[in-house]
């Protein structure tokens, strides 16, 4: 195989055929189906969800592996391609902003003008004495998430300064903090005195915080991929587009959590 067939001779982003978008859509469908069955109390639905979630992780790993090969071995991620990927990711974050804006809209729609069915008060009758104290686990999780943002920034600037060891240390700390945050969320859910079916308050609370938790899981996967690429010398101080996208995503989750903490945990309760 000569160089003309092994490397592309243009700077543009020509998408090669890949099975992973199709497989990702399939496993996402089964994830949603399993979650719906679990909420309706179907037997063995949690096992079904676990299997489908493992399929999601496997598909993401295989897709990331192919993208890493295209970028680091095939040389497909030229400056023009990298610029296009960054613009696409920024547009994706804008769409995510509107998604969370709709959730906050639903929350304020119910809380600013509570109906008679809710007792004309917020939190609703029966929930007011069950809300989660914002100065306990939520405050700890806020500190953890903001600290993870600082350690991730440290890792980024260490990579730019060609200090691979400190970049890895910063990423290790960020990933450890992300697991602590998810553990705090799981503990909070397990001990919460209300459920997702307890009025619009419970639905808004679990939908907003749960969706944010899913974003933290996805962000952790992105950072794990970046850690692997730095560890295997695939990323340099000038070539780390995937890592930068993961950083943008993580800081986006930080900002969303601050809004969640101030509105739902403090003001809303």
Swiss-Prot record:
It catalyses: 4 Fe(II)-[cytochrome c] + O2 + 8 H(+)(in) = 4 Fe(III)-[cytochrome c] + 2 H2O + 4 H(+)(out). Its main location: mitochondrion. It comes from the Eukaryota. GO terms for molecular function: cytochrome-c oxidase activity. Keywords: Membrane, Mitochondrion, Mitochondrion inner membrane, Translocase, Transmembrane, Transmembrane helix. The keyword Translocase applies. It is found in: Mitochondrion inner membrane. SUPFAM superfamilies: Cytochrome c oxidase subunit III-like. It is a multi-pass membrane protein. The keyword Hydrolase does not apply. It is an enzyme of class 7 (translocase). The chain crosses the membrane at residues 19-39, 44-64, 87-107, 135-155, 170-190, 205-225, 247-267. Its EC number is 7.1.1.9. GO terms for biological process: mitochondrial electron transport, cytochrome c to oxygen. One of its GO terms (cellular component) is mitochondrial inner membrane. Belongs to the cytochrome c oxidase subunit 3 family. Component of the cytochrome c oxidase (complex IV, CIV), a multisubunit enzyme composed of a catalytic core of 3 subunits and several supernumerary subunits. The complex exists as a monomer or a dimer and forms supercomplexes (SCs) in the inner mitochondrial membrane with ubiquinol-cytochrome c oxidoreductase (cytochrome b-c1 complex, complex III, CIII). Component of the cytochrome c oxidase, the last enzyme in the mitochondrial electron transport chain which drives oxidative phosphorylation. The respiratory chain contains 3 multisubunit complexes succinate dehydrogenase (complex II, CII), ubiquinol-cytochrome c oxidoreductase (cytochrome b-c1 complex, complex III, CIII) and cytochrome c oxidase (complex IV, CIV), that cooperate to transfer electrons derived from NADH and succinate to molecular oxygen, creating an electrochemical gradient over the inner membrane that drives transmembrane transport and the ATP synthase. This is Cytochrome c oxidase subunit 3. It comes from Schizosaccharomyces pombe (strain 972 / ATCC 24843) (Fission yeast).
């Amino acid at each position: 195989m000569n160089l003309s067939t092994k490397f592309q001779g243009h700077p543009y982003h020509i998408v090669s055929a890949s099975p992973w978008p199709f497989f990702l859509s399939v496993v996402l469908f089964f994830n949603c189906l399993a979650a719906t069955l679990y909420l309706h109390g179907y037997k063995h639905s949690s096992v079904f969800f676990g299997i489908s979630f493992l399929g999601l992780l496997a598909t993401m790993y295989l897709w990331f592996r192919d993208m890493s090969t295209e970028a680091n071995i095939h040389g497909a991620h030229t400056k023009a391609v990298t610029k296009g990927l960054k613009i696409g990711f920024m547009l994706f974050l804008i769409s995510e902003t509107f998604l969370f804006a709709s959730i906050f809209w639903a929350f304020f729609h119910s809380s600013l003008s509570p109906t008679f069915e809710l007792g004309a008060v917020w939190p609703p009758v029966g929930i007011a004495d069950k809300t989660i104290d914002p100065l306990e686990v939520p405050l700890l999780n806020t500190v953890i998430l903001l600290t993870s943002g600082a350690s991730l920034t440290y890792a980024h600037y260490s990579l730019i300064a060609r200090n691979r060891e400190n970049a890895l240390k910063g990423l290790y700390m960020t990933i450890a903090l992300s697991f602590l945050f998810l553990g705090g969320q799981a503990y909070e859910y397990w001990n919460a005195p209300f459920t997702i079916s307890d009025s619009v308050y419970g639905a808004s609370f679990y939908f907003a915080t749960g969706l944010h938790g899913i974003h933290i899981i996805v962000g952790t996967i992105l950072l794990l991929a970046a850690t692997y690429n730095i560890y295997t010398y695939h990323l340099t101080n000038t070539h780390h587009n995937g890592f930068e996208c993961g950083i943008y995503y993580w800081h986006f989750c930080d900002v969303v959590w601050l809004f969640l903490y101030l509105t739902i945990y403090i003001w809303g309760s």
